[in-house]
Amino acid sequence: MYESYINKIEDVGKLRNLKPGTIRTYQNNIKDFLKFINKHPNELTCEDARDFLLYLKNKVNKASTLNNKNGALVFFYKRVLGKLWDDNLVPRAINDYAIPRVLSRSEVERLLDATPNLKYKAMFALMYSAGLRISEVIHLNYDDISRTNMQI
């Protein structure tokens, strides 16, 4: 229905060097928003965006999902429509941070004992003892380790 606006999201996104996945996400989020609000984009207000996010919140969406939609709306309003955005009227949701579950010493020992490959055993031990993520261990270089201080 408003395909020219959806196409403009792609054009502006490319100019701003957004990744193709981000552009597609923005387009899909704005399509959902326009279907929900059922107004011409030139008539949109921040209250419309707020109503949409409240609707999604009432459908028990997570804060990260709401913030994803909010980001698409901000981009659409400011960059595509050239409208002002009121962060006070349409605030970002506060993330629900989950406390990570930490393995017990016996669970770590069982993991290491169950890993026959010495390389992976060393990686798991390093991840656990230094609190590193998988990507941090994978990208670790020889020069990242201070052998005199025994520190990473």
Feature map (PLM): residue ranges:
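Conserved catalytic core of the tyrosine transesterase superfamily
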Residues: 1-152
